[in-house]
Structure formats: C-alpha cells, structure tokens
Design a protein with these regions (language model features):
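N-terminal secretory signal peptides that target proteins for export/translocation
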Residues: 1-5
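Bacterial N-terminal signal peptides
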Residues: 8-21
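A residue-level marker of the well-folded mature domains of exported/periplasmic proteins
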Residues: 24-341
Length: 341
C-alpha cells in the first residue's frame, strides 16, 4: 500500500505534466479547513500551500476556501455544496473529514478529492500525509539536550496514529539525549481550542515540564511557553513571532509543492488515487532555524541525524514497516499520561 507513495511530487512528474494540454478554463479548486486560517498553525500552513499553488499556476486555477468547518455533518454539507458548485478538485484538510468526503465523492464521481491524513481511498478520493515523526524525533533530541528537569510536556489533539507517532518519535529522540527523560501527554480531544491548549500547557508546566510541544492548531502553547519562561518546540508553523525567546526550533509543514503537483495532474488528466506519505526529503516538513542559544554541539548532533534521515541511513522507528507505523496505537517507554486506547 505504501510503495511508491511520493512519486507524484517528484521533479520528473512535474516536468512530464507540463507537457500536457491545460484546461480551457481555470481548474476550480476548493479547500476545506477545520479552523480559522489565522496567523499560524495547521490551517495556516495548508493555506500557505494553497497560495503557493496559486502563485505557481496563476490563471490555470481558481480557488475557494471554507474555514472553521466542524468535522462531521457540517463538513459533508460543505463538500457537497462545493462539488455541486462545479469545483473539480477538493482538498479536505482534517482527519475527521474522511468519511464525509467518501460519501460526497460517491455522489460526485467526476470530482477529485484529496484527504489529509486518511487511510481509505476511492476511485476519485486520494489520501496524503507527511512523516511528521521524522522531525519529531529530531525535535526530541533537541528537547532532551535543552531540558533541565528531564520532563517535556506534550499537548495533543486526538489519540490517532499520526499523533501517537509524533509523541513516540519525540520520546525516542529525547531519551537518546537523556535516557531518564519523560514526555508527559495531555489530550485535548480537539484539534483547535486555544483556551484548553493554554490550560493544558499550564498544567504540564506545573507538573515539571520545562520544554513544551504540541499537536494542536493554535499558537496558544507557544504563547504560554513564552509567558512562563519555558522552552518550546513549535509545531506546524514557525512560532518565533509568538515565542521569540522560548522557541528552540519548529516543525514546519510545507504543502505548496504537493498541492501544485496535484492540481497539475488534474489539469493534465493524469490524476489517480495513489496515497502519498512524504517525509523530510520530499519537502513536506522541515525544521525552522535553531534558536541562538542552542549549543553548537547540539546543532551538530541534530544535523547529523537529519542528514541520516534524508539519506535513508536512519529511521526513527527502526525496523518497523510503514504499515506498522501507520497503525501505531500505543506509547513507547518514557511517555506518561492517559493512554491512547
């Protein structure tokens, strides 16, 4: 299932697609977002990808955005309306949009759907995701070197495999730097709730965490780290504007290349459902610049591991297969908090 996942994003494919005739009219592309676009976070990064696609393709595409759409019936209604309005490509950018997207895709077989983080496909629905865990491991190495208490706090959305992968990879990296380190997890059961994200961050600080990270959609954790004087590994966006002294680095999502490639494939008539799980070497994720107070030897360690990942010489989860990683549902040693099951 996971073989040849990233071919749709290669330079060779982009060059090949450019040789095919384009639509006579702009391709109508819609993006459905689970939270407001805002200034940073999950949805903001997807919208940066949309804008990069527009910049790359110009008048070949015309985009529509619907933001702050709840998972469930609202998402289904919005996607159905977009399909009925003549959108030919719809990006459903939240995990809980999968079942609604599958239902709408069955009703509109001529419309192409791309779902972020899903695990089911259809004749006209593809899934895509990033190997966030690669950068999470590197961030854990950095956190393990930076923490004085040996405790990191992790504010997490829902206990789905993608989130569990990130928690485990972070813990593996942190414990490589400090074998006694702990990662304490608090679940939000929400992807975007700034008030609860802040509350969870404060609780983790009270429990001894002097480094925070998160898998949630607002800058609240970053702002709390800055306010309380603890360190931060930001997620989704570079949060230096919110945490100029707290941020060590950030795990940055980059969707522009993928969105551009998908739109080009639809325009060229070459689109097909071929699940994509891209990593750091594919440009889906990157580390933001390190803070000025990160020691040179720590940077050297993280960079050495990053190069090993890029070159395929190191895998954070060792011999686990892609299928095993994709189904991850339990914590590794060093993680504490309510279990994912």
């Amino acid at each position: 299932m996971f073989q040849n996942l990233i071919r749709g994003c290669t330079a060779a494919l982009l060059a090949a697609l450019a040789a095919f005739p384009l639509h006579a009219s702009p391709l109508k592309v819609a993006f459905v977002y689970v939270s407001p676009i805002g200034d940073a976070g999950w949805t903001h990064q997807h919208d940066l990808g949309r804008r990069a696609m527009e910049q790359a393709l110009g008048d070949q595409v015309k985009t529509t955005v619907v933001e702050a759409v709840a998972e469930g019936p609202d998402a289904e209604r919005v996607m159905r309306d977009l399909a009925a309005q003549g959108h030919e490509l719809i990006f459903a950018t939240s995990f809980g949009y999968l079942e609604p997207a599958l239902r709408v895709a069955a009703e509109f077989p001529a419309v192409k759907f791309e779902h972020a983080g899903g695990y089911k496909t259809a004749a006209n629905l593809n899934t895509y995701n990033a190997r966030y865990y690669e950068a999470r491991y590197l961030a854990g190495l950095l956190a393990g070197r930076a923490s004085r208490t040996g405790i990191a706090g992790y504010v997490a959305g829902f206990p789905v495999p993608e989130v569990i992968q990130g928690i485990n990879a972070f813990a593996i990296g942190m414990r490589e730097a400090n074998p006694k380190a702990q990662v304490k997890v608090l679940w939000l059961n929400s992807w975007f709730d700034p008030a609860r994200e802040r509350e969870a961050a404060l609780t983790l600080i009270h429990q001894g965490a002097d480094v925070l990270t998160n898998h949630s959609g607002s800058p609240a954790v970053a702002q709390t780290a800055e306010e309380k004087g603890v360190k931060l590994v930001a997620y989704q966006s570079d949060m230096r504007r919110f945490a100029p002294t707290a941020q060590l680095t950030a795990i940055v999502h980059q969707w522009g290349g993928y969105y551009t490639a998908v739109a080009r494939s639809v325009i060229a008539g070459r689109w097909k459902p071929q699940p994509v799980w891209g990593g750091m070497k594919d440009g889906f994720i990157a580390l933001a610049p390190f803070a000025g107070d990160v020691p040179k030897e720590t940077i050297a360690l993280v960079e050495a591991r990053r190069r090993a990942i890029l070159e395929g010489r190191f895998r954070p989860f060792g011999a686990l297969s892609d299928a095993q990683i994709a189904a991850m549902d339990s914590f590794v040693p060093g993680v504490s908090g309510p279990g994912p099951k």
